[in-house]
Amino acid sequence: MVYLLLGTGFEETEAIAPLDLLRRAGVEVATVGINGKVVYGSHGIGIEADLELGQMDLTSLE
């Protein structure tokens, strides 16, 4: 499992492009909102994260 952490003011393209490429490659990826489930990027675009920070399963990390 790969966690992509998203915080307020993140660069949308820098988050979405790698997320797309990883998922196309078959990598299991979850987006994680640091400041809640909905996170707003630098251009005001809201992204609903898969998880909030407290929901991460740290036992699945390698």
Question: What are the functions of these language-model segments?
Answer:
Residues 1-62:
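Extended, subdomain-level signal for the structured scaffold at the beginning of enzyme domains
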